[in-house]
């Protein structure tokens, strides 16, 4: 494996970040999109042998990637890609790949229907649209505020230049075993806009996102926390919508062609005349212009302590038309609106279902449909009329309708929902659905962190304890999680938490950061004596935003085990054995792998589960 063991730091093993290899080359194979201008020093099309020649020198360019906090219980390697020549090439080439043009007849029908939806459901919400620049600005970190300071203070003019910078996100990812071979994941490439683009688009897009969420726009699931999801599942259950259809759009960002972008641009043009913090023409330019320049640049030596002293290496740029950039403000909002509109077209036009006969959750490229149990083949055929469906029917010759492709389409029930890397179970005693992390991802990824490259033993112990306490917000009384989560509990030395004050942020005329939020966070952190490092503070803050207000009760443990026994094919006795082995630090790999590779999907049709004792 290329995830090479590097050294020990404070008794914890530390691993190097990863470079590309011959297995990641296949994701770069393909022709450039029409109109794409390739000005990168590495040729657009190279052989696997030449591809490997650009691998970075471990002694000069590799950063420390992951620290292992506790022993792992699964054999799957965990890797972390970094920004280097090869990974940047991989990212920029995937962004520039050719995507099939949508069919003209589909475009005409879909645009007509979609515009009608926008006129009746979205346009009325925008008539009284308002946004607060102060609220958006106060929500930024100090570093983010300094980044946009020249334009915030009027020191510089915003140029009409739609420029982005490509980089590789440091993110821990699991390497999975597929047919006896390790299947390497793609690196996470981010096209980050220049700071002045964030200044122009950020306040308005954030307000649109809040507006859609507050008015429960059909399918819009941005800003929903786990309590909201549990309540939503309860509503679906009360309406008898037990059957679920889950899917994921493959390569959505680069698949978003000009005609699909028009779905979002209708709203942007409608609110452009209400933009006051900058020139409205700039707002329309950055959100409605087709041509984008994406730069490729990196530091020659990726050493963390002296990064500012390293020379900047420019690898070139590409000019591309009509795609979504993964790091821009409208990415989550725009993709959610787009995918929900496409799924609604399948349900309401192709299948001729009433809008109120089903429920829909969409966030980015993930979606779940909740409906009354029906013929699965009918649903498959309907999706084939809109999406490229190789994931549904590998042997069939399929056509692109919308120009987008489904990665998979999975049928199940409410308790089979794994929306956005979460799992769901129903506690009959509490009469509610509970949302947790996915069990396999929790066991595989949690032991590793990328936040502690130069931490002291004291800081590491505080970070581990922060993970333990924050996980208790959603895993309390669930033995399958608690038995492993208890490994992170550390002895924490008393330490003084330095409270961040509002004056640390750059003030604006009509508001400061909400002091109540700071006090609330400080109270929670003081209770557990958490060190004031930002990485630990963020761990707790994410728990407050996303995790449930009330943790699971003791009665939830039985129902969680029952769901896992159905999903993974374990008996209740085997689940107790798994818990015992994990608590006693005994090997448990055989039982876990058998369950996670369980192929019996009969539970997906078990619609009467909720009615049984």
Model feature map: region roles:
Residues 1-613:
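Viral RNA-dependent RNA polymerase
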């Amino acid at each position: 494996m290329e995830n090479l063991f590097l050294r020990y730091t404070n008794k914890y093993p530390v691993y190097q970040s990863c470079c590309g290899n011959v297995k990641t080359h296949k994701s770069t194979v393909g022709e450039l999109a029409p109109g794409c201008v390739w000005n990168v020093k590495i040729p657009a099309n190279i052989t696997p042998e030449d591809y490997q020649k650009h691998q970075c020198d471990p002694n000069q360019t590799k950063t420390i990637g992951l620290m292992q906090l506790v022993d792992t219980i699964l054999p799957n390697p965990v890797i972390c890609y970094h920004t280097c020549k090869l990974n940047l090439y991989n990212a920029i080439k995937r962004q520039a790949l050719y995507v099939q043009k949508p069919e003209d007849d589909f475009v005409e029908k879909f645009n007509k229907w979609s515009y009608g939806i926008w006129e009746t459901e979205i346009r009325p919400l925008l008539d009284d649209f308002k946004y607060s620049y102060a609220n958006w600005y106060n929500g930024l970190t100090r570093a983010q505020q300094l980044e946009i300071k020249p334009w915030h203070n009027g020191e510089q003019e915003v140029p009409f230049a739609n420029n982005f910078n490509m980089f590789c996100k440091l993110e821990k990812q699991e390497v999975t075993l597929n047919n006896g071979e390790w299947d390497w994941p793609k690196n996470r490439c981010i096209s980050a806009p220049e700071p002045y683009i964030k200044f122009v688009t950020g306040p308005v897009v954030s307000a649109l996102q809040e507006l859609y969420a507050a008015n429960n726009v059909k399918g819009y699931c941005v800003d929903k926390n786990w309590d909201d999801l549990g309540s939503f599942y309860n509503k679906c259950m009360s309406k008898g919508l037990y059957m679920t259809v889950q899917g994921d759009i493959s390569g959505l960002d680069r698949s978003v062609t000009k005609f699909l972008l028009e779905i979002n641009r209708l709203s942007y043009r409608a609110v452009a005349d209400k933009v006051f913090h900058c020139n409205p023409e700039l707002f329309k330019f950055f959100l409605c212009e087709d041509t984008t320049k994406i730069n490729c640049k990196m530091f020659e030596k990726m050493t963390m302590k002296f990064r500012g002293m390293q020379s900047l290496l420019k690898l070139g740029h590409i000019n591309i038309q009509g795609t979504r950039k993964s790091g821009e403000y409208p990415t989550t909002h725009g993709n959610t609106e787009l995918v929900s509109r496409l799924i609604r077209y399948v349900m309401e036009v192709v299948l001729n279902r009433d809008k109120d006969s089903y429920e829909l959750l969409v966030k980015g490229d993930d979606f779940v449909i909740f409906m009354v149990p029906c013929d699965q083949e009918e649903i498959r055929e309907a999706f084939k009329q809109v999406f490229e469906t190789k994931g549904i029917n590998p042997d069939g010759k399929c056509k692109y309708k919308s120009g987008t492709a489904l990665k998979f389409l999975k049928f199940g029930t409410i308790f089979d929902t794994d929306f956005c890397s979460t799992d769901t179970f129903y506690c009959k005693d509490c009469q509610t659905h509970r949302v947790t992390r996915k069990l396999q991802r929790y066991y595989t990824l949690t032991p590793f962190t990328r936040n502690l490259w130069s931490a002291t033993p004291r800081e590491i112990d505080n970070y581990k304890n922060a993970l333990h306490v924050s996980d208790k917000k959603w895993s309390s009384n669930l033995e399958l999680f608690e038995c492993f989560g208890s490994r992170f509990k550390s002895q924490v030395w008393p330490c003084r938490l330095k409270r961040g004050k509002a004056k640390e942020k750059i003030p604006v005329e009509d508001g400061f950061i909400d002091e109540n939020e700071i006090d609330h966070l400080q109270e929670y952190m003081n209770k557990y004596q958490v060190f004031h490092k930002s990485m630990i503070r963020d761990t707790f803050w994410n728990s407050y935003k996303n995790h449930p207000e009330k943790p699971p009760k003791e009665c939830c443990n039985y129902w969680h085990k029952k769901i896992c026994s159905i999903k993974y094919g374990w008996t209740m006795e085997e689940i107790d054995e798994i818990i015992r082995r994990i608590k006693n630090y005994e090997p448990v790999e055989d039982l876990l792998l058998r369950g996670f590779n369980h192929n019996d999907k009969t539970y997906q049709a078990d619609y009467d589960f909720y009615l049984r004792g």
